[in-house]
A protein has these predicted regions:
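Active-site beta3 strand of CheY-like receiver
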Residues: 44-50
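C-terminal output helix
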Residues: 106-115
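Active-site residues of response regulator receiver
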Residues: 8, 52, 82
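Charged docking surfaces used in two-component/phosphorelay signaling
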Residues: 15-23
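Short hydrophobic/Thr-rich beta-strand motif most characteristic of the beta2 strand and flanking loop
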Residues: 25-32, 40
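Receiver (REC) domain active-site loop signature in two-component systems and cognate sites
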Residues: 55
Length: 128
């Protein structure tokens, strides 16, 4: 089973991402702030972490840096999923250790395709 962490303080975004990626082969966990995201990641060891940049308590860039230092998250693929769309924002996300950077608003199909490409286990999902 694949585990995906959604870290975003906007419930509507969490719901959209959950709906997009929901599958019997996928466990989805979420966190509404950056500090909680680090704790959930430490406990759940997600295969993919989708991080908003602008979150309370700890921003997504700092969450990304912390996850990269955790041995239990060494395998985690990190996607910054954020409204910060400038080239400098993208550069900061990738420099923080993200594997990919997807801006809001995003296409649900683009998100699903990206997650499938990032994680080989995603191939167990049937085509929609």
């Amino acid at each position: 089973m694949m585990t995906i962490l959604i870290a975003d303080d906007e419930p509507a975004i969490v719901d959209l991402v959950r709906f997009t990626l929901e599958d019997p082969h996928v466990q989805i966990v979420d966190a509404a702030d950056g500090a909680a995201a680090v704790e959930v990641a430490r406990r759940e060891r997600p295969d993919v972490a989708l991080l908003d940049v602008q979150m309370p308590r700890l921003n997504g860039l700092d969450v990304c840096r912390q996850l990269r230092r955790l041995p239990e998250c060494a395998h985690t693929r990190i996607v910054m999923l954020t409204a910060a769309a400038q080239a400098a924002d993208r550069r900061r996300g990738l420099e923080a250790g993200a594997d990919h950077y997807l801006t809001k608003p995003f296409s649900p199909l683009a998100l699903l395709t990206l997650v499938r490409a990032l994680v080989p286990e995603a191939s167990v999902w049937p085509a929609r």
